[in-house]
Amino acid sequence: QDYKKAFEWYEKAANQGLIEAQNNLGNMYYFGQGVKQDYKKAKEYFGKACDGGNQIACINYKKLNPWGY
């Protein structure tokens, strides 16, 4: 699996407002797949996807709250 290439494509799609890509990018930041692990960035992208109606992203967003992100 080429996580770096996947990250590039998800980032392009997320920046164009694709909700699933925003959630996937959040996951990549959360797990450090293809990019340095960054919980703040993960929460940012989960928040965007949640605002777009992705319920899984909303759950992921809320999971980061107790950690102070």
Question: Residue ranges of each PLM-predicted region?
Answer:
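Hydrophobic face of amphipathic alpha-helices that form TPR/SEL1-like repeat modules
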Residues: 24-31, 60-68
